[in-house]
């Protein structure tokens, strides 16, 4: 916020300057005027760790989106793309019938899931994706993965793009 000066009214009024001479004998109220600078500052996770062990068990971590803006923001879109030969499948896919090392992956983030087969998908967002000023949005995520012949620990399998915009009025 930037201080604009002292004024004779809460809104509008005349600015009081160092050249003004005060001759009032009664109490007088002056009002500080500020210009609020809107700031859009949001921190999104750089990595959502996902480990698949030899038994096909998926292990995830904790993540959150942090809103450091001067107002509410909303996640308006979440798009995912596969990397390194992986393919998206619906999250409810039964992976027991998929070949070992088929590199298929169904993904869930908060209450939104993959529903298509392919390399990219923009998720249908379900549940609240708004983040109050100075608030946080916890990100829970999970995956179903086709069986692997060796653990997958240090390979990028997805790229996720969060689109955020001002929320509220």
Language-model features and meaning:
Residues 36-37, 63-70, 121-169:
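C-terminal, structured domain-capping segment
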């Amino acid at each position: 916020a930037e201080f604009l000066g002292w004024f004779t009214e809460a809104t509008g009024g005349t600015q009081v300057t160092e050249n003004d001479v005060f001759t009032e004998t009664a109490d007088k109220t002056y009002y500080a005027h500020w210009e609020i600078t809107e700031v859009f500052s949001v921190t999104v996770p750089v990595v959502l760790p996902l480990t698949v062990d030899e038994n096909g068990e998926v292990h995830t971590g904790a993540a959150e989106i942090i809103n450091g803006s001067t107002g509410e923001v909303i996640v308006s879109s979440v798009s995912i793309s596969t990397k390194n030969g992986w393919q998206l499948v619906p999250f409810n896919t039964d992976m027991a019938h998929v070949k070992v090392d088929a590199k298929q992956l169904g993904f869930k983030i908060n209450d939104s899931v993959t529903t298509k087969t392919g390399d990219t998908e923009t998720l249908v967002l379900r549940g609240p994706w708004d983040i109050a000023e100075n608030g946080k949005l916890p990100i829970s995520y999970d995956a179903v993965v086709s069986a692997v012949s060796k653990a997958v620990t240090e390979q990028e399998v997805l790229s996720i793009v969060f689109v955020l915009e001002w929320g509220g009025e």
